[in-house]
Amino acid sequence: MTNVEVAATVAPNQLLDTLTLDNIKEYSNDIDIIELRIDQWEDRHLELLKSNLEQLQELNINANVLVTYRTISQGGKGEMTHEAYMTLLKEIIKNHHCQMIDIEWDSDFDVFAHRDLINLAHRYNKQVVISYHNFQETPDIDILKFTYYKMNQLNPDYVKIAVMPQDKEDVATLLEAVATSADTLDAKVIGISMSKVGLVSRTAQGVFGGTVSYGCLGEPQAPGQIHVKTLKQQLLFYSNH
């Protein structure tokens, strides 16, 4: 059984609104990480990010901020070219006061460029979540384990896979990959089977060696997300049994 951190995903249109800020404050005891999505912004990413981070700092709560730009190819709204995406992440790493950054992984990407970016993040004392998302299916167990293995080779702090299940067997496949990888890899493992079918992957993550579960404060930002308070309660239930 591993300790599982709760990440609350927020995706402001521009600045964080009063309701979201109040919710973060109200449920701060249930939140370990605030995932700030920025792919919904069409432009002014660095300017808006600076303002959002200042808003979160003013709350004075004990939670790390994870900045995520999710591309269309991995289920987000981000339309940047890969080169522009990598440049944006470099600027965020060097110039913004967040504690964590999400870096997408794909088998077609330049391994050396990704390793350099992760090393840069570590030089600026930022933790790295390297992530892979598949909104169409759950790959075979061997592909999932190999993906975790390849991501781990880049020396991130966390390796994350989120996939779409078609049935309960797909959920079991994802959780088996999480359990095996958690026992063998240096990085902390995150595994999410999306939608209602995969809810157990969020609530029982710690049973299988997972380390972070993503929830919401209002409207879910990914299929199957539940409110952070409910998520925290469910995680505690599994940790006490």
Curated annotation (Swiss-Prot):
Signal peptide: none annotated. Its EC number is 4.2.1.10. One of its GO terms (molecular function) is 3-dehydroquinate dehydratase activity. It catalyses: 3-dehydroquinate = 3-dehydroshikimate + H2O. Gene3D superfamilies: Aldolase class I. The active site is at residues 133, 160. It is an enzyme of class 4 (lyase). This is 3-dehydroquinate dehydratase. The lineage of its organism: Bacteria, Bacillati, Bacillota, Bacilli, Bacillales.
